[in-house]
Amino acid sequence: MIRFDGVTKTYGGGPPAVDHLTLEAATGQISVLVGPSGCGKTTTLRMVNRLIAPTSGTVSIDGVDTATMDLTQLRRGIGYVIQHAGLFPHRTVVDNVATVPRLLGWTKARARSRAMELIELVGLEPDLAKRYPAQLSGGQQQRVGVARALAADPPVMLMDEPFSAVDPVVREQLQQEFLRIQAELGKTTLFVTHDIDEAIKLGDRVAVLRVGGHLAQFDAPEKLLSDPIDDFVAEFVGRDRGYRALAFAAAPALPLRDEATIALGATPDEVRSVGNDWVLALDDDKAPIGWVRTAAVDRPVDRTLLHRGGTVARANGSLRALLDAALSSPSGRGVVADPDGRFIGTVLATDVVSAIQRERDAERASQAQAGTAAYGLDEENAP
């Protein structure tokens, strides 16, 4: 657990960079600090490992005031990942990852063995271990940075915009890898980002900071989206928060629609015989590979005729995933697959909206029933 108690940081006679901050980052969870430039999120992070000293207040880890701890031991017990990885350019990947274990007195063999475990854990090929940072892509360097931070198995991780310097595709991959690793290791993580979408995706709880280091709201992502505390948080979270909140709503057992499908190589007559403007193509494993527009088929179906714009939702996914699949599909029919990626049916946007309405009606009915019970009334005597 990382706890801030009335923490303030000022520089000279200027206004506070962080102002009377009190919050608690729970053990084993990802707590995200997010806010506009100048809100003090990085300053807050750096006060945990005492790269910056608070002007007043206390920062504690598992109940121990960090100001009372030996500085070297404090920092060696905290994993730290920064924006541009910060790797040592003169050391190979394996030696970069082994840095902290070696500082802690591990033998070279033990430290390197641990480093190789982590290189694989973060999704890197073992043969990259002998390369130098300059020989890696930006995404690979960030993975090495995460591996190095985890090398000594620290209970606490600090991550300062670790994925912001890579392209969107790599960023998505790194985020997914990070969530996988966190699910496996359960570190107490304080994560800084300026991107509210990243905060909502990664955080168990999200702290929204105002300029000047004031805490506006600290809540679960779904709470931020459904119930922002004021106009500042509502504006910062975004006008489409209702749609994004659907990512946290588990999809009910929607009845899926049957859909006629074709395989690659289907003839124009076979495609037209389906009787739809758009026909879904599956591969040999029954996985969806794209839609074919019937009017455009003038030869046996090949991959050049496929429209791949639509996303594929999982049957056990969220309402947002189902709605996105329907809205992004060129046919208007969202593709749904089982956990193994095999096609099982389609869903319309109207199906999802109806499911949302049913969920809300059921919630209102439940709340009304609870209110009636609280006053000791049965349904017949309720006002």
Which role does the model predict for each range below?
Residues 134, 152:
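Conserved signature/switch motifs of ABC ATPase nucleotide-binding domains
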Residues 146:
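Hydrophobic anchor residue at the start of the ABC signature
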Residues 49:
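Helix-to-loop junction immediately C-terminal to a conserved catalytic motif
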Residues 90-98:
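Short coil-to-helix segment of the ABC ATPase nucleotide-binding domain corresponding to the Q-loop/switch region
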Residues 102, 109-127:
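Conserved ABC ATPase "signature" region
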Residues 257-285, 308-367, 373-383:
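The conserved cystathionine-beta-synthase
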Residues 65-79, 103, 109:
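ABC ATPase NBD coupling module
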Residues 34-36:
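The feature captures the beta-strand-to-loop junction immediately N-terminal to the Walker
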